[in-house]
Amino acid sequence: MWFPQIIAGMAAGGAASAMTPGKVLFTNALGLGCSRSRGLFLEMFGTAVLCFTVLMTAVEKRETNFMAALPIGISLFMAHMALTGYTGTGVNPARSLGAAVAARYFPHYHWIYWISPLLGAFLAWSVWQLLQILDYTTYVNAEKAAGQKKED
């Protein structure tokens, strides 16, 4: 799955570069005052929030799964709002690579945009697994039942 996504990211970067006049301005770069370690952790937590949202809304079996795109889109939007000024918001290595290839600009810290999403996905998966082990659905269902009793 990685290879086609990387090819698509480079194709999208090339297409965006071809459609916009002048220099490519959509590459990921650390903002002024943002160190590599801060960038690493910001990207990691942004990716973790996105991945955790996907796990809780699309992977978990519920009646509301048909609406999973809404919270996923909102979490991606919030990640961009929070991180763009600091890191350019990579969140996806293929997107970061595509923009870097189109701009022919690979900063010495480009590795952040590859390592952070992997760490963030692992963090989100770990929290999700912990919730599975703790059987959080028991508490959610008990709270739903208590809420329905109040209404009756």
UniProtKB/Swiss-Prot annotation:
The lineage of its organism: Eukaryota, Fungi, Dikarya, Ascomycota, Saccharomycotina. It comes from Saccharomyces cerevisiae (strain YJM789) (Baker's yeast). Residues 27-38, 87-110 are extracellular. It comes from the Eukaryota. Disulfide bonds: none annotated. It is a multi-pass membrane protein. It is found in: Membrane. GO terms for cellular component: plasma membrane. A motif (NPA) lies at residues 92-94. Residues 1-5, 60-65, 132-152 are cytoplasmic. This is Putative uncharacterized protein SCY_3531. The chain crosses the membrane at residues 6-26, 39-59, 66-86, 111-131. Its main location: membrane. One of its GO terms (molecular function) is water channel activity. Keywords: Membrane, Transmembrane, Transmembrane helix. InterPro entries: Aquaporin-like, Aquaporin_transptr, MIP. Pfam families: MIP. Belongs to the MIP/aquaporin (TC 1.A.8) family.
